[in-house]
Amino acid sequence: RYMHHTIKDKNQSIWIAQREGRAKDSNDRTQESVLKMLAMGGEGDIIDRLIEMNILPLAISYEYDPCDYLKAQEFQLKRDIPDYKKTQEDDLKNMQTGLFGPKGRVHFQVASCINEELEKLDRSLSKPELFSQISALIDRRIHANYRMYPGNYIAHDYLSGTQAFAGHYTAEEKKHFTDYIDQQLARIELPNKDIPFLREKMLLMYANPLTNYLATRTDNPK
């Protein structure tokens, strides 16, 4: 209700994250629980209540993720130790690294309001299906507005074993990115480092935004 009051009555904007933290593999998806919370206030049905919010998806694109090596490390720990749980110290290290670590170029892109698309949805759908479709709509808007960097194309080519995106980066940029990945891998503190596994996980973090971006090209949302 506070958010509806702030937006509708006070005519002020509010920023809210689409999920709790970034996805470890950079395959970010909107949590339906966030939409359910937004639809708790306002008047009318779910669609009416969300239209009141005038939702504008925001895409944030980082050239580098300073936590990439920590995420890769956690992937191996969870693979090797089924009941592995991060400690409070681990969480604090992740927060500190994420806040103060180098991110390279950062781009913010605000997409257009989704109200027109919300109006087109079938209001007779069940709540789970409706929230699922709205989440997918927001995800498409965010993914379509990502800013791609050389590392995204290089990582995708490495994983596919092709040079499909070679036109998007130079030999110098490829060497720089490869050296960066090697440096980050060297920071991982594990007694039994599985380098091929860790490298693949890190490359996926940079390839997935491009994969999601390409998936929106047929829809061409703005």
What are these regions (language model features)?
Residues 1-14, 21-222:
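Membrane-interfacial terminal anchoring regions of lipid-handling membrane enzymes
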